[in-house]
Swiss-Prot record:
It is an enzyme of class 3 (hydrolase). This is RNA pyrophosphohydrolase. Its cofactor is a divalent metal cation. The keyword Secreted does not apply. PROSITE patterns: NUDIX, NUDIX_BOX. It holds the Pfam family NUDIX. Belongs to the Nudix hydrolase family. RppH subfamily. GO terms for molecular function: bis(5'-adenosyl)-pentaphosphatase activity; guanosine-3',5'-bis(diphosphate) 3'-diphosphatase activity. Keywords: Hydrolase.
Length: 162
């Protein structure tokens, strides 16, 4: 018998998200390596114990794209945390079943390097390929349960995006 999980009893996982833009204002989008269907997203991940959100953002950027902090310029930070809930079919199956979704702080960075410096084949590889895309295409490409988050993030950083 499968046990039913009440999402209201679970906390949100503290995370960061990174909107990485190039000189034209296009957004870095990575194709998730663990998805059987096209699932594009921006770099994101958990905040480690004792880590500040901005530190976590730069660490996640490095782990997922191979881009070091010296090759990006801080542009902005979203004023509010945003949350999303996992859909029922994923609840209890990811993150050891400990979380109902994520609570994210988003950061906007401008990439100062060249495309050939991006290295997604890192020790913590999350993406099978990547590309630069416009804001509307990024929102359309994300999995549906994260779409409201991406809409809010894009609206927040709109003045800087292509």
């Amino acid at each position: 018998m499968e046990r039913t999980i009440d999402p209201g009893t679970l906390p949100y996982r503290p995370c960061v998200g990174i909107v990485l833009i190039n000189r034209e204002g296009l957004i870095f989008a990575g194709q998730r390596i663990d998805s059987p269907v096209p699932a594009w997203q921006m770099p994101q991940g958990g905040i480690d114990e004792g880590e500040k959100p901005r530190e976590a953002a730069l660490r996640e950027l490095w782990e997922e794209t191979g881009i070091p902090a010296e090759r990006v310029e801080f542009v902005a930070k979203a004023p509010d945390w945003v949350t999303y809930d996992l859909p029922p079919e994923l609840l209890g199956r990811v993150w050891g079943g400990k979380y109902r979704g994520q609570r994210q702080k988003w950061f906007l960075y401008r990439y100062l390097g060249t495309d050939d410096e991006v290295g997604i084949g890192t020790d913590h590889a999350e993406f099978s390929c990547w590309r630069w895309i416009g804001a509307e295409e990024m929102v359309a490409a994300i999995v549906p349960f994260k779409r409201a988050v991406y809409e809010e993030v894009v609206a927040t950083f709109r003045p800087h995006l292509a």
